[in-house]
């Protein structure tokens, strides 16, 4: 039996001064974690106990679909160079040299190592599919560690990798992971949403994130409460309401003086129109395409509706990953002969196709393509131009969905208002394709004896993030509560006076009875005031408390549900049934 008096559970009444988010404050106060250095934490008894339960759930579900490996955290430079990621990872990677001068790194993820095993060991389609996973410590030289366990430099991750003979096989492996992740997060008691995501540096053809809504999050997700639509704002779309175009004031573009009006809102108000009828112009310098001979930057101008924001991830996809930087005021003046705040699309010879690297590119957001009689900068100080119709008043290189979805816009599936909120990512699944098997030379023979590349998937879960997301979802002023499946203990039995032999003995018997019934129990046998014990019990995340006090002489104890604050007096025979009902996972 676990006795509180024999354990080290260093609870604190005050949160650390640098703690900003609830999970950081409470996990430190509850004695789960202690900071060793920036972004580096020790797990104390309660924290380690919870983490082990989380890891156990993940392992059980992953064993149903794959095989567990354990790979080295220390990786040679050569294997990361083979994939091209030694340079790509930059300062995020911890790098070191051994005594002989050989360069190594601490693994951030293990696509390369798993692919190397596949390259050496897999020979035939008969050996596929394969799903290999591990649960291991990872390292990332995070530039600004913060928010407790949410942004760290050392973390525990479940990463898995699938190898299939073709895309149809990858679809199956991907779905197996999707379903396993849903089971894992359901068992961990999390409220989560599965969203379509941008694959980013991972590459590949498909990607989904498992996200938990919390104000501590850094990723924005758009979701619909009326249907299943959910997407990271990097990928999210929405239906746009019809906008009434302005009536033309002339048959051709017309110059209009706008003295002292600099912002879109100021110009719109001055002209008596909505920002929805104005064009927002953004100017960038774009890196030369890979393989370009001269390596010169190319001008890129993006046009959005006046009330819309640019989605940089969508822009990156539209220009095929070429790096961009904002144009300086001097560059705008030199290239377009326009003051920076008055740049517009008129009187510029734009590239007709994206392959034309000699002229500036002009990209339109889709919301502007069919609009008429818009207002934009006139490339002249304190002047704008109206009656602009894209494709007539000026030509453009191309169009794409480039805007950021906003709160309340209609869902693309059902038209219901979208919710946009902060989230924390707890899991991510990718269809990697052939990126690593191609780069590292992994090949197998197909059923016709032809040498082909296996197709890959990559799948990750952040273990600490399951714990922190749960705390973020379930806390109040007094502390937090964890779902029974991942709480360090399910029940704390608290005698209100350990000096009273009957109460102390009764509490021991109740704790033993609950343990025999299969509950994970801690007995708070400390010689402390009841108020101190109750505060600690509320703080440390245990879902049920049993107070053994004055009514024990009547054969009753007080049973308290931490999350709902429901309290009732129960007889000893009733306790097991009541607690079992409370702790049963919701369907």
From Swiss-Prot:
GO terms, biological process: prolyl-tRNA aminoacylation
E.C. number: 6.1.1.15
Compartments it resides in: Cytoplasm
GO molecular function: aminoacyl-tRNA deacylase activity; ATP binding; proline-tRNA ligase activity
Catalyzed chemical reaction(s): tRNA(Pro) + L-proline + ATP = L-prolyl-tRNA(Pro) + AMP + diphosphate
SUPFAM superfamilies the record matches: Class II aaRS ABD-related, Class II aaRS and biotin synthetases, YbaK/ProRS associated domain
EC class of the enzyme, as a word: ligase
Principal location listed in the UniProt entry: cytoplasm
One annotated Gene Ontology cellular component of this protein: cytosol
Keyword annotations from UniProtKB, A to Z: Aminoacyl-tRNA synthetase, ATP-binding, Cytoplasm, Ligase, Nucleotide-binding, Protein biosynthesis
Record's function text: Catalyzes the attachment of proline to tRNA(Pro) in a two-step reaction: proline is first activated by ATP to form Pro-AMP and then transferred to the acceptor end of tRNA(Pro). As ProRS can inadvertently accommodate and process non-cognate amino acids such as alanine and cysteine, to avoid such errors it has two additional distinct editing activities against alanine. One activity is designated as 'pretransfer' editing and involves the tRNA(Pro)-independent hydrolysis of activated Ala-AMP.
Matching NCBIfam families: PRK09194.1, proS_fam_II
Name of the protein this chain belongs to: Proline--tRNA ligase
Organism: Koribacter versatilis (strain Ellin345)
Organism lineage: Bacteria, Pseudomonadati, Acidobacteriota, Terriglobia, Terriglobales
């Amino acid at each position: 039996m676990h006795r509180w008096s024999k354990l080290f559970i260093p609870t604190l009444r005050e949160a650390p001064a640098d703690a900003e988010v609830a999970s950081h404050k409470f996990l430190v106060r509850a004695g789960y974690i202690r900071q060793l250095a920036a972004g580096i934490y020790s797990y104390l008894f309660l924290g380690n106990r919870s983490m082990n339960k989380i890891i156990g759930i993940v392992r059980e579900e992953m064993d149903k679909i794959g095989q567990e490996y354990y790979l080295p955290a220390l990786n040679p430079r050569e294997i990361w160079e083979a994939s091209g990621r030694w340079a790509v990872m930059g300062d995020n990677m911890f790098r070191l040299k051994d005594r002989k001068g050989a360069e190594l790194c601490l693994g951030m993820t293990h696509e390369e190592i798993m692919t190397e095993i596949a390259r050496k060991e897999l020979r035939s389609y008969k050996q596929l599919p394969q799903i290999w996973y591990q649960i291991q410590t990872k390292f990332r030289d995070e530039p600004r560690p913060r928010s407790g366990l949410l942004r760290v430099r050392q973390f525990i991750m479940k990463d898995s990798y699938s190898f299939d003979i073709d895309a149809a096989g990858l679809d199956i492996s991907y779905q197996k992971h999707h379903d396993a992740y849903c089971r894992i997060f359901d068992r961990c008691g999390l409220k989560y949403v599965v969203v379509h995501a941008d694959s980013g540096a991972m590459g590949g053809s498909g990607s989904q994130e498992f996200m938990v809504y919390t104000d501590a999050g850094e990723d924005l997700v758009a979701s619909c409460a009326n249907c299943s639509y959910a997407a990271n704002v990097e990928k999210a779309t929405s239906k746009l309401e019809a906008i009434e175009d302005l009536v033309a004031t002339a048959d051709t573009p017309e110059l209009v003086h706008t003295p002292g009006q600099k912002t879109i809102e100021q110009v719109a108000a001055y002209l008596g129109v909505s920002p929805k009828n104005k064009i927002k112009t953004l100017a960038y310098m774009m890196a030369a395409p890979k393989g370009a001979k001269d390596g010169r930057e190319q001008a890129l101008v993006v046009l959005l509706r006046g009330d819309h924001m640019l989605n940089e991830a969508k822009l990156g996809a539209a220009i095929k990953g070429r790096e961009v930087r904002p144009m300086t005021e001097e560059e705008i003046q030199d290239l377009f002969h326009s003051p920076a705040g008055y740049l517009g699309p008129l009187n510029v010879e734009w590239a007709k196709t994206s392959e034309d690297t000699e002229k500036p590119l002009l990209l339109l957001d889709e919301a502007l393509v069919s609009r008429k009689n818009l207002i934009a900068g006139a490339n002249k100080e304190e002047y704008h131009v109206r009656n602009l119709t894209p494709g007539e008043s000026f030509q453009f290189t191309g169009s794409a969905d480039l805007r950021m979805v906003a709160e309340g816009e209609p869902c693309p599936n059902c038209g219901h208002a979208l919710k946009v909120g902060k989230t924390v990512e707890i899991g991510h699944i990718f269809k990697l394709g052939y990126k690593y098997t191609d780069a590292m030379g992994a090949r197998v023979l197909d059923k016709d004896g032809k040498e082909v590349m296996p197709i890959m998937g990559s799948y990750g879960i952040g273990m600490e993030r399951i714990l922190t997301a749960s705390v973020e979802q379930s806390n109040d002023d007094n502390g937090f509560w964890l779902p029974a499946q991942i709480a360090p203990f399910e029940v704390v039995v608290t005698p209100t006076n350990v000096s009273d032999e009957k109460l102390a003995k009764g509490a021991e018997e109740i704790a033993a009875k609950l343990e025999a019934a299969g509950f994970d129990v801690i007995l708070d046998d400390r010689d402390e005031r009841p108020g101190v014990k109750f505060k600690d019990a509320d703080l440390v995340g245990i879902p049920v408390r049993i107070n053994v006090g004055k009514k024990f002489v009547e054969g009753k104890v007080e049973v308290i549900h931490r999350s709902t604050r429901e309290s009732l007096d129960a007889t000893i025979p009733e306790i097991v049934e009541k607690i079992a009902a409370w702790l049963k996972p919701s369907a």
